[in-house]
Amino acid sequence: MLNFYGHEFSSRLLLGTAQYPSPEILRKVIDKSGTEIVTVSLRRETAGGKHSGQFWQFLKELNVTILPNTAGCYTIKEAVTTAQLARDLFKTPWIKLEVIGNPDTLQPNIFALVEAAQILNNEGFQIFAYTTDDLIVAEKLLEVGCRVIMPWCAPIGSAKGPRDTDGLRSIRAYLPDLTLVIDAGIGRPSHATIAMELGYDAILLNTAVAKSGDPVLMAEAFSKAVNAGYMAYKAGILEARDVAVPSTPIIGKAVFS
């Protein structure tokens, strides 16, 4: 079972709720994927006027766990204030903490991220920290109280898939007991499988499903891909070799003179 701050879940696929063609498509995606956790931007809820209340009511009817996020925040103050508002609105101590450093790459500002995480941890938040694939940053986030860390595998929405598998693998190796979720950059189901084969606990994605030609079918594909990668990691994956190794035994082989 997947465990986030003492709560257990069966699905290892988390989904964003933006960019879907319609709420009904989103409903079908959640049902088909089996996901139990969806992320929601507070800015969407507060900026949408009367429609924001309708969307919040729609989410409550889905019977899934809501993970609010601080998407679009560029400063510590913005992120902390947004998290506080999200806690009041969604009635949860969970927050997916994002502090963006560059508007083009959407790369996290790791310095502001660590400081904001420390502030929010002191206020009792349970933080899901969106960060890069840098081990030292992950260790610093752990030091300030983050128990779920979400390294990217590529920039948000880029669909490039895991670019630095060595970096992602080192985070898993050095932090074996920490819950790790790949967040951002996943473009195809095979990317999700690769990430899970590295030993990660879950995948969070949005664009790859929402903007596909058939979001419902793609959601099912990702669900199966995540499970396949997780099962492969647990089973023990064969190490790559530089030379051929025969798979057929030679015992009993006929000898011709």
UniProtKB/Swiss-Prot annotation:
Catalytic residues of the enzyme: K96
SUPFAM superfamilies: ThiG-like
Residues engaged in binding 1-deoxy-D-xylulose 5-phosphate: G157, A184, G185, N206, T207
GO molecular function per UniProt: thiazole synthase activity
Cellular component GO terms held in the UniProt record: cytoplasm
Assembly and oligomerization: Homotetramer. Forms heterodimers with either ThiH or ThiS.
Protein name according to UniProt: Thiazole synthase
Taxonomic placement: Bacteria, Pseudomonadati, Pseudomonadota, Alphaproteobacteria, Hyphomicrobiales
